[in-house]
């Protein structure tokens, strides 16, 4: 496994390694990128294993992107565990790209940015203004740097996945997006690097989010209103959890559905559990 921190090295390393592994039309010549912000956990391992299953050279990026953190958010305290991350990836990834912010943004944070459009201002975007512009900017840069054929993302960040897919389509980027299902703890809590912020009481309450989603899924036969009511009742019964948003969105447009909507959708939830903000989602079908 090669660990790289410098753009000059990574710009050609992944593709050069891929070509060396086989003919240009062989699976070994494929580059598969797994973008992360580090503080890796079993959910990330699942993404990397999926990347390995796709065949080719697996590149994992580790970069805490300042552009996607707003004022008052947790940029400074976001966990940085590079040594442990590299050890975890040994034997799984072929290349780890772990640049400093100055390497990614040599002109500073006022450099050219990608904008997420109208959907980028909804839900997570409304709660975290500018977040998705920053996320798309760094993902676009990583696509240009690593030149992947495939990029792997987790379904837990459903709005992120939607927006990355839109960017790829709108800008005609030659990248296929692969999505891996959310990995959960035994009690249903979605794995997240932010889970380590939870104290004992908050950790016990955090599973409320996945239970609320499960209650919503169970109520699908009653339509959108029944889904939202069932999920909201569960959340309101847990005083440690403060709801940010609970919404059903069309899987295709990521817009909030009408009360009489029928078809595939995502049930999204975001809440503060103690002092920690968590998100989750489930696929649903409204009959």
UniProtKB/Swiss-Prot annotation:
Protein known as: Pantothenate synthetase
Role noted for this protein: Catalyzes the condensation of pantoate with beta-alanine in an ATP-dependent reaction via a pantoyl-adenylate intermediate.
Name of the coding gene: panC
Annotated organism of origin: Leifsonia xyli subsp. xyli (strain CTCB07)
Pathway(s): Cofactor biosynthesis; (R)-pantothenate biosynthesis; (R)-pantothenate from (R)-pantoate and beta-alanine: step 1/1
Keyword annotations of the record: ATP-binding, Cytoplasm, Ligase, Nucleotide-binding, Pantothenate biosynthesis
PANTHER family per UniProt: CYTIDYLATE KINASE/PANTOATE-BETA-ALANINE LIGASE, PANTOATE--BETA-ALANINE LIGASE
Subcellular location: Cytoplasm
Binding site for beta-alanine: 68
The organism's taxonomic lineage, starting at the top: Bacteria, Bacillati, Actinomycetota, Actinomycetes, Micrococcales
GO molecular-function terms, A-Z: ATP binding; pantoate-beta-alanine ligase activity
Keyword check for Ligase: yes
Record-listed E.C. numbers: 6.3.2.1
Keyword hit for ATP-binding: yes
Binding-site residues, ATP: 37-44, 154-157, 183, 191-194
Family stated for the protein in its record: Belongs to the pantothenate synthetase family.
